[in-house]
C-alpha cells in the first residue's frame, strides 16, 4: 500500500532541474602542447623569480619558528593525491586551529575560508595578497602533478563532500591559476559559482584559452585583486 507521500510524489514528480555535464572531450594534441607550455613557463618562472624565493624564505624564517615550505596532500586529475607545496603563510599549528574556526566559515559548500583568518601571519598576509605563497607550486608543475592553468587542487576532505556534478572539476589536471580566481572572484561565497567557472574552462580549454587566463592571472596578481 502506498503512503500519502508516495501518492503525492507520483502525482507531482520532482521538477527540480538536474545539472547535466557534457562528457569530457579528449584533446591529445592540446594536452601535448600544454605540457610543453607548462615546462617552459614553470622553468622560466623559477629562474626569474629565484631571488624572490630567497627573500620570501628569509622573511618567513625571521618572523618566527616553523618551516619555510608548507606541504599538504591535495587531489589532482581523477582524484589522484599528491603533495602540494606553498610558502608557509600561517602559524605552525594552523591545521589544529581550523576546527575551532569552522563555525566562522564564510564559504558555501565544502571549502573553508574566512576573510580575517587569525592563523595567518604578518608575512603570510602579504605573500597571500600577492600570491607569492603559491610560487613553490611551480615545482609541482615540473613534477607533473599540476599544470599552470586549471581548477585549483582541493583537499581530500573537501572532495569527500562533492556531489557527482562537482566531481567533474577533477576531470583534468589541477592548476596554479584557475579561471574563477583570475576573474577576481576568489573571495566569492558561492562554491557552485566556482564549480561552474571551472567546468566552463574545462569545456573551452585550449592553448589560446590558457594564454588568456595566464595573462589574466598576471593582471590579477599585480593589481592585488582575486589573488591566486
Where are these regions (language model features)?
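A hydrophobic, helix-centered structural microdomain
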Residues: 23-96, 207-228
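Juxtamembrane loop-helix boundary motifs flanking transmembrane segments in multi-pass membrane proteins
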Residues: 17-32, 115, 119, 154
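Hydrophobic structural segments characteristic of membrane proteins
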Residues: 1-19, 135-228
Amino acid at each position: 500500500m502506498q503512503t500519502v507521500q508516495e501518492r503525492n510524489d507520483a502525482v507531482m514528480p520532482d521538477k527540480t532541474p538536474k545539472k547535466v555535464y557534457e562528457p569530457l572531450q579528449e584533446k591529445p594534441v592540446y594536452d601535448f602542447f600544454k605540457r610543453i607550455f607548462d615546462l617552459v613557463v614553470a622553468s622560466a618562472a623559477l629562474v626569474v623569480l629565484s631571488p624572490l624565493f630567497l627573500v620570501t624564505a628569509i622573511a618567513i624564517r625571521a618572523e618566527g619558528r616553523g618551516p619555510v615550505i608548507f606541504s599538504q596532500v591535495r587531489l589532482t586529475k581523477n582524484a589522484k593525491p599528491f603533495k602540494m607545496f606553498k610558502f608557509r603563510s600561517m602559524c605552525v599549528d594552523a591545521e589544529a586551529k581550523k576546527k575551532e574556526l569552522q563555525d566562522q566559515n564564510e564559504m558555501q559548500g565544502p571549502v573553508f575560508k574566512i576573510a580575517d583568518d587569525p592563523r595567518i601571519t604578518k608575512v603570510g598576509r602579504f605573500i597571500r595578497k600577492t600570491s607569492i605563497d603559491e610560487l613553490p607550486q611551480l615545482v609541482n608543475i615540473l613534477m607533473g602533478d599540476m599544470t599552470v592553468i586549471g581548477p585549483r587542487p582541493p583537499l581530500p576532505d573537501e572532495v569527500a563532500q562533492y556531489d557527482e556534478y562537482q566531481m567533474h572539476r577533477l576531470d583534468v589536471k589541477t592548476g596554479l591559476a584557475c579561471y574563477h580566481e583570475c576573474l577576481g572572484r576568489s573571495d566569492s561565497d558561492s562554491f557552485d559559482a566556482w564549480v561552474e567557472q571551472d567546468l566552463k574552462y574545462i569545456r573551452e580549454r585550449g592553448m589560446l584559452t590558457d594564454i588568456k587566463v595566464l595573462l589574466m592571472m598576471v593582471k590579477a596578481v599585480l593589481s592585488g585583486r582575486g589573488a591566486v
